[in-house]
Amino acid sequence: MEQSTTRSLLKGKILKILTLLLLVRLGLYIPVPGVELDILTQGQTSNPMFGFAKTLVGNSFLGIGSLGILPYINASIIIQLLTPLFPNLERLQKEEGELGRQQISRYTRYLTCIWAIVLSSAIAFFLIKPITFGWSLKLGLEIVLSLTVGSILSMWFAELITEESLGNGSSMIIFINIVGGIPNNLSSLSKTFSAANLASAIPLLLTGLGIYLGIVLIIIFFQESYKKITIVSAKQLNLTTSAQTQSERLANNSFIPLKLNQGGIMPLVFSSTIAVVFMYPAQILLSSALLTNAAGLASKLLTIYSFGINFVLVIFFSCFYVSLVLKPKDMSENLGKMAYSIPGIRQGKETTKYLEKVINRLAFIGGLFLAFLAFFPLFVGNFIQFGLFKNLTSLLILIGVITDTTSQITGYLVSTRYEGLK
């Protein structure tokens, strides 16, 4: 009876999440009032800055939900960056508990609204205005209002999804948007191979699929890998028996699992949103009259610049995000309070330094791997023209969301069964 109730509750949660994700996708296809889609389609070729708009909104045309959770993610990044700098924010995060976290969430929502208005205004007055006939201030304000409301709704949907405790709402929205773009990628891939000679296309396709599946396995291994830091209690250290050697006792001890990719997909999410800001001046430079005679060289330089920016940002946000999630000093203090220690490491400052060293090393290695996924398409594209390699970071996000959601569902089922046994 209890098991059937648990399953029905789980089905209800999944149905609610799928409904909210469907609403997010529908928002992408509801056109902004007063903006004709055919004019925007022409603008993609006539206005070189429309490429930047497409990157920003994540869609080929403009819908009221095109901004999505981009302002929400940017606001979260800004709040996290400001927290260590302002004592009041740090106190709310560390000392106020749930009430403090709710207050920080409230600040994040306020900042999301402000940032959504800024981005909507930039899109309306700098990108849509030059390619729209009959422009007026009223039309501009309607566009800003539509995009802002769509972004706020996306933020609300993300928080509702997170409240179901089956995964992160923002990550799931990014996931569903990536999945929505898969048909276009497969269509372009089929056109590539249909245009090629069939005899040469089959070996190329098999080679590409083999490499792609290998990368999937590597990503899964990377996502699930972690380092064990053995910890022992004071009683275990003092316990000496002839039947149990020290090495045997250590083998049975508890440990702290530190994931190799502690930041998960968040460094990629952060870097992709911030990279857009750095790409803005590069897009202007590329479209300027000074580079009209060197368009090919400018395009290559822009590609190298793009990968370089993403490489640096991914490593930075990998280390930064881990520093927010894991606090070596707090971990050391908690171990001391529980009378646990790391074998061979003294309690106190030495434990803090050791944990800091291990965490920083893991964060850097994780950042390098994420950066490798960003760089890999650039190198493999010189040898294999395989469209799926262009979205390896998206692949990592897909795998990360799937594994995280699976573990959350498993944890939910286990916890409900445990509560039923009480």
Curated annotation (Swiss-Prot):
Classification of source organism: Eukaryota, Haptista, Haptophyta, Prymnesiophyceae, Isochrysidales
Transmembrane helix found in the keyword field: yes
Subunit structure: Component of the plastid Sec protein translocase complex, which is composed of at least SecY, SecE and SecG.
Protein transport found in the keyword field: yes
Principal location listed in the UniProt entry: plastid
GO cellular component, as recorded: chloroplast thylakoid membrane
One Pfam family cited in the UniProt record for this chain: SecY
Source organism (scientific name): Emiliania huxleyi (Coccolithophore)
Keywords, alphabetical: Chloroplast, Membrane, Plastid, Protein transport, Thylakoid, Translocation, Transmembrane, Transmembrane helix, Transport
Subcellular location: Plastid, Chloroplast thylakoid membrane
Name of the molecule in the record: Protein translocase subunit SecY
SUPFAM superfamilies hit by this protein: Preprotein translocase SecY subunit
Membrane topology: Multi-pass membrane protein
GO process terms (BP): intracellular protein transmembrane transport; protein targeting
Stated role: The central subunit of the protein translocation channel SecYE. Consists of two halves formed by TMs 1-5 and 6-10. These two domains form a lateral gate at the front which open onto the bilayer between TMs 2 and 7, and are clamped together by SecE at the back. The channel is closed by both a pore ring composed of hydrophobic SecY resides and a short helix (helix 2A) on the extracellular side of the membrane which forms a plug.
